């Protein structure tokens, strides 16, 4: 009979006190004897087999609390039964359950076969009739564990009892040996191409719309309030719309920014500030753009208190010397550096004329000294203050720029 079944039998009968340790063996009354280090057929949650020594010590000390039990195992140099295994093990040994998934049935059968010869040698004084009765008892326990007498053993159950999961569902889904980086790269390229096409389409539409709006404000489109046909067109318009053949952006309002790096706003970071309402330092944006400085960029107002307002596109440039005479008529705003040399070679006689025809903005940090804006205060320039750290306030500053700019453009078109 195997050690686990013998221990279960003695536990159910209440004969635990008859289990004695003699040297390196455990004696179960006068019937059985097993080495203390014998591995039983009961497997722990971690997968290892419990020794007979560990199970006997646990059964005899099952009433102890967890801390006291652990101290007892250390004191007696006995392997401990883990906390998750204790209740299922005790339920099996006390007969509350007939079997357990933790039992290695193949090992159980092997130990049963081996222990028969050992126990016969241990009890030489026992007659054959006693041995036969013990064999009958073993048969009864096997019937109890594996089914009714005469039924076949479920070998599938025995095989499954030895199965151990090698990989979990999560481990399979992780796909450690698979690399999907190429899929990500291709997807990113397609998305960037789609955004680029949409951006060009949107820009072309905004440019065309801005041209028509500018032409209407100048009164060169052939609309008339009377004297025309039913559709409102004048039969003899005073002027007609003529576009010169030129580069893209003709007719689009222009905003000038300083080319010097010591100012807060340049062609590097003006797009994020005006379109997204977020200020990014020049050096950070220049590093992101790898030092590539564009000659011209297009910005548009993406946010407004008036949601029904028409979106207008603007060109932003930082080289006034490259502007042609016709281009200066499209300049509507300038971000000033606060230095007179910024306006050198401009087609205006003084600052008064400049800021009568062009609205000026001076962007500064709110905690900068007053001396930094001393010269600017002598000009007709709008001072816009932003915080060095509170980026959530940038949107309000950008919105103030847009409102002042739109108000100036409307007043200029009506003058």
UniProtKB/Swiss-Prot annotation:
Disulfide bonds: none annotated. Disruption phenotype: Early flowering. It comes from Arabidopsis thaliana (Mouse-ear cress). The gene is CDC73. PANTHER family: CDC73 DOMAIN PROTEIN (PTHR12466), PARAFIBROMIN (PTHR12466:SF8). It comes from the Eukaryota. GO terms for biological process: flower development; positive regulation of flower development; transcription elongation by RNA polymerase II; vegetative to reproductive phase transition of meristem. This is Protein CDC73 homolog. Component of the nuclear PAF1 complex (PAF1C), which consists of VIP2/ELF7/PAF1, VIP3/SKI8/WDR61, VIP4/LEO1, VIP5/RTF1, VIP6/ELF8/CTR9 and CDC73.
